[in-house]
From Swiss-Prot:
One of its GO terms (biological process) is DNA recombination. Residues 147-197 are annotated as: Domain III. Pfam families: HHH_5, RuvA_C, RuvA_N. This is Holliday junction branch migration complex subunit RuvA. The lineage of its organism: Bacteria, Bacillati, Bacillota, Bacilli, Lactobacillales. Residues 64-142 are annotated as: Domain II. The RuvA-RuvB-RuvC complex processes Holliday junction (HJ) DNA during genetic recombination and DNA repair, while the RuvA-RuvB complex plays an important role in the rescue of blocked DNA replication forks via replication fork reversal (RFR). RuvA specifically binds to HJ cruciform DNA, conferring on it an open structure. The RuvB hexamer acts as an ATP-dependent pump, pulling dsDNA into and through the RuvAB complex. HJ branch migration allows RuvC to scan DNA until it finds its consensus sequence, where it cleaves and resolves the cruciform DNA. One of its GO terms (molecular function) is ATP binding. InterPro entries: DNA_helicase_Holl-junc_RuvA_I, Hlx-hairpin-Hlx_DNA-bd_motif, NA-bd_OB-fold, RuvA, RuvA_2-like, RuvA_C, RuvA_C_sf. Homotetramer. Forms an RuvA(8)-RuvB(12)-Holliday junction (HJ) complex. HJ DNA is sandwiched between 2 RuvA tetramers; dsDNA enters through RuvA and exits via RuvB. An RuvB hexamer assembles on each DNA strand where it exits the tetramer. Each RuvB hexamer is contacted by two RuvA subunits (via domain III) on 2 adjacent RuvB subunits; this complex drives branch migration. In the full resolvosome a probable DNA-RuvA(4)-RuvB(12)-RuvC(2) complex forms which resolves the HJ. Has three domains with a flexible linker between the domains II and III and assumes an 'L' shape. Domain III is highly mobile and contacts RuvB. It comes from Streptococcus uberis (strain ATCC BAA-854 / 0140J).
Amino acid sequence: MFDYIKGQLTKITAKYIVVEANGLGYIIYVANPYSFSDSVNQTLTIYLHQVIREDAHLLFGFHTENEKDVFLKLISVSGIGPMTALAIVAVDDNEGLVAAIDNSDIKYLMKFPKIGKKTAQQMILDLSGKFVTIPEGGQAQQMPKAKGNQQLDEAIEALLALGYKATELKKIRAFFEGTDDTAEQYIKSALKMLMKG
């Protein structure tokens, strides 16, 4: 089992990042890969959780230990797998998640990808009162704004990887078309919009 990895960030995709440590490149699934954009080719520390399956060993990474703690609590709930938990952690407002669980707000919880009524009820049952700390969200600094829509395309691709439907994301794309921002900021803004419905 791993607690964290310290190495050089060598690659960012819509679903994962690659960190090289001791000559090996580790694929690490993260909530918002583009939040690491300012750290490409730099040494960084990523907190890890390893999932071992019959067909694969997967690493899930987090900016902070608090993010990791939220993820671990989420995957302890029956019906929530690691990818669904990552999609929930990706939402910047984890205060909203904690409040929804503590206030039994099923409708709010059902806004997350792949969370139905039954799973939302199970989240409330299993996690109510269990969040002592709230994660700070992404720790990455903003990178300089890029021209064109490449950043928006990357953000949409990352949201698809988190489990959001293409039909939902058409509205997001239309809303942000013609704007100039980073993929990280597009993702944060889009997640807030998606959670509001």
